[in-house]
Amino acid sequence: MSSIEGPVRVRFAPSPTGSLHIGGVRTALFNWLCARHYGGQFILRIEDTDEKRFVPGAADDISASLRWVGIDWDEGPDVGGPYGPYVQSERFEQGIYQPFINQLLEAGLAYMSFTTEEELAQMRAAAEAAGIKAFRFRGPERDWPLERQREEAASGKPYTIRLKTPLEGETRFRDLIRGGDEIVVQNNQLQDIVLIKSTGMPVYHFAHLVDDHLMKITHVMRGEEWVPSTPYHVLLYDFFGWPRPVFAHLPAILRQDGRGKLSKRKDDVATQRFRERGYLPETIFNYLALQGWSYDGVTEIMTRDELIARFTLERIQPSPARWNPEKLRDMNGIYIRKLTTEQLAERVLPFMQRAGLIGDPASETERAYLISLIPLIHERLEELQEAPDLLAFFYQDVVPGETYNPADLIPKKHDAAQTVALLRAAHEALSQQTDWTPPALETTLRALCEQLQVKPGPLFGAIRVAITGRSVAPPLFDTLAGVGRERSLSRLAAAIAALENLA
């Protein structure tokens, strides 16, 4: 896996700038699986140094989303650890980063830049006008003695601190997912990036690297969008004389049509949305593990323990993964069908409560009734949010002209009068029924078909609409049993009355 000795230590270090993107969960999951497979530690660190994009409550959303999926951490903001604090703003307040930036300044490997944003914009515009495609900033202060820089700063001028990148030579690093091949970047293609903002707050490039070193991170697994920034990180590791971690840049997740990456700005992929729609955490866990990783190219349904046992970094693919909502939905259906009736009822209950079909808290009677209905939808359910609609007619009145159009009662090749006759016969037969179980109801209604010399389809279809208000519903005899004798007969009577007005 790598030449690094000792326990594997990996981290997920999100920025609290909004809801956690499903791609972020994939990054966290791969790090978590790596830690669990190799017997290491998984660390959660909140990188909140971007004050402008900081969203209050986002850090809590990140933690809640990870826990919902089933990802826990060995060290982090709420569980502590030997290398805390695990929130960058708190680390900044403790002065953790200052000695390291001072070290770079003293060594002439970083410098204070007094170039303003306006001047920088003018330089970019001038470069563009001159036909220079890639503007690379090198501040004039990079050649100033440190004493002069400090004098300028003491005068009150605002400044940033920039990395003094070499003008010559090349920077090399390896990426485990890209076969360990060496990636070579010419240093004259780099620029002097900002390490410390004018507010004194460190930027990602600097803060994450110091934190990774101090927290003894051995493997840096992150999205491939960070590959172009890695030369700067490698330079910093080398400037400090620190051992480099193993870099493993995860493949992008493309939209289903392959046109661009999944985006939390353009695509409905906030983790919370999948939870709201009724995707099981087991589904998300399993599906995301397959976004850029494969066990044998065939096996797809795997438990947490199986994924931990089978996961290796060598099986992560460098080519982009492709998001497939239909496949995710199908997988969710598979996991739903793995649940027992009682387990599914418990998962469905909050959705029924939000729909106003069941009280909150639910009574024992309500729970028992829901459990009795679950077998009717267990095989059909693919998202838990579908349950209230599928079960609504068991809880709400079915009224002709409101719930459904009375004309929907009429089967093909039948008229209203013929349908009234069918439903009257059904109402009469069921009125005499005392055993209201699915087998007994089926026996009675099939016998009625023979007596009337009609095919089951038209009669059963008309009864189904009368009872449920729909042409598609769970099996008819189970539905009648679930609705109950009194309500079933009442709905049949209402359907007959409505049809008589059409006849």
Curated annotation (Swiss-Prot):
Q: Name one GO biological process term.
A: glutamyl-tRNA aminoacylation
Binding residues for ATP: 264
What keyword terms does UniProt attach to this protein? Aminoacyl-tRNA synthetase, ATP-binding, Cytoplasm, Ligase, Nucleotide-binding, Protein biosynthesis
> Single GO cellular component annotation?
cytosol
The top EC class is: ligase
Would the keyword Signal turn up in this protein's UniProt record? no
User: Which SUPFAM superfamilies does this one have?
Assistant: An anticodon-binding domain of class I aminoacyl-tRNA synthetases, Nucleotidylyl transferase
Q: Name one GO molecular function term.
A: zinc ion binding
InterPro entries attached here? aa-tRNA-synth_I_cd-bd (IPR045462), aa-tRNA-synth_I_codon-bd_sub2 (IPR020751), aa-tRNA-synth_I_CS (IPR001412), aa_tRNA-synth_I_cd-bd_sf (IPR008925), Glu-tRNA-ligase_bac/mito (IPR004527), Glu-tRNA-synth_I_codon-bd_sub1 (IPR020752), Glu/Gln-tRNA-synth (IPR000924), Glu/Gln-tRNA-synth_Ib_cat-dom (IPR020058)
Chain span(s) of sequence motif 'HIGH' region: 14-24
HAMAP family (alphabetical) = Glu_tRNA_synth_type1 (MF_00022)
**What role does this protein play?**
Catalyzes the attachment of glutamate to tRNA(Glu) in a two-step reaction: glutamate is first activated by ATP to form Glu-AMP and then transferred to the acceptor end of tRNA(Glu).
Describe its assembly.
Monomer.
Q: What is this protein called?
A: Glutamate--tRNA ligase
Tell me the name of the encoding gene.
gltX
